Amino acid sequence: MRNKNLLEFCLSPDLGGLELFVANCFNDFRTKGSCKIAVAPDKKLDNYLEGKDKFYIKRNKFFPIIPALKLARFIDKSDIDVVHFHWTKDIGTVVLAKVLSKKKPKIIQTRNMTMTRFKDDFYHKWLYKNIDTIHAVTYQVKEQLERFIPKDVCPKVEVVYMGTKELDIKQQKVQSLKDKYNLTDEFIVGIVGRIEEGKGQWIVIEAISMLKELNIKVVIVGHTMDENYLESLKQKVKDLGVEDKIIFTGFTKEVDAHMKLFDVNILATPKETFGLVVIEAMVNKVCMIATNSGGPLEIIEDGVDGLLFDRSSEDLAEKIKLLYANKTLKESLALSGYEKAKEKFEASKQNEKLLNILKGM
C-alpha cells in the first residue's frame, strides 16, 4: 500500500472532543507518512497546535467559494491524495475544493454528530455524491447515515471508535493541583467539557445540592462557550447553598492530570454522539457515570465498567451516593473501565485502523 499525502481539515473555532480528535489524527498520522493540516487562524485549535506547520484558511459562510479556491490551490500544490474533514460546517468548502481542484482528491468525513433528518434534497445529494467515505464514530451513527442519506449517493460508511492513550501523570503534579484547589480528603466528582447548557453542568450542581451532608466537592473543568450560562451556573450554586462544594477551573490543557483528582467523572450530555471524555476517564482509572443514551451505550456496560443514569439530577444523586458509600464498587467499576479502555479504545490501535482506511482510498 503506497504512502498517500493526507490533509487534516478543520475550520472550527472551538476546542472540544471533535477538535482534539483532529489534533490527535494529525499528530499521529504525520509520524507515519505525509500529513498536513489546515485550520482557521487564531482560533482555539490553531493555538492548541502551537509550533506546528499549519496551513491557514478563513471560513466564509457567505462566499464559500473563496476558501474553497484557496483549498483547491493548496491541494494541487501539495499533491494531496486524501482530505479528511471533521466539522460538518466544512462540508461545502471541502467538496467545492475537490470539484475546483485538478487533483480531485478522495474525501473522507469523520462524522461526530448524529443525523436526524433525510438528506434527499439536490444540494445534499450533490455533497454526498462527492464524498467517498464517512467514518462513523459509533454504530448508531452508521445506522443513521445509511437511513437518512439516499442509497444512490451514500458514501461507504466505516465504523472506527475513537481512541485515547494513558499518560504518565506524576503524583507531584496531582498534588500541586490538589493544593491549587484546596482539596484534602473529599470525594471528588468531576465533569469535563465546554461550559454550555448542553453539557449538563447544572444537573451535577443540582445533584450535589441533594448530598450536602456528604464530604463531596465538584470540579468543573472546561472553557466557557456561553458567559450567560456560566453566570446562571454560579447563581444556581449560590441559590442552592453549595458555594463551598463547587470549583470552576476554566480551560486547561492538563485534562488527564485533573482527572486524576476525581473519584467519579460525569457525562451529562443528553445525546452525546460518542463521548471521548468517557474513555479518557476510564483510561485514568476514574469511575464513569454517563447518560443512558447515544455513544455511552456503546462504551459502558451498566454496573460492570461504569454506571448509566437517566439525566435527572435525582438519579445522578443516587448514583453518586452509591459510589460514595461503596468504595469497593467504585474501584471495581474503575478497574473494569480501565481494562476495557486499554483493550477496545487504545489510541494507537484505533488510529491505525482509521489510517488504513485513509490509505486504502
Please state what every model-predicted region is.
Residues A38-V39, C287-A290:
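Short hydrophobic beta-strand element within catalytic cores of glycosyltransferases
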Residues A38-K43, V192, K217-E231:
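Glycosyltransferase donor-sugar binding loop
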Residues F251, P270:
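Aromatic "clamp/platform" in nucleotide-sugar-dependent glycosyltransferases that forms part
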Residues G16-N24, F187, I191-M210, L214, ...:
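A conserved mid-protein helix/loop that constitutes part of the nucleotide-sugar donor-binding site
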Residues R30, P105-A136:
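A conserved, positively charged/aromatic
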Residues D302-G303, L307-E314, L322-K327:
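Conserved acidic donor-binding segment of nucleotide-sugar-dependent glycosyltransferases
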Residues E8-I66, E146, P155-K156:
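N-terminal strand-loop element at the rim of the active site
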Residues I131-K156, T164-E166:
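A short, active-site helix/loop in glycosyltransferases that binds the activated sugar's phosphate group
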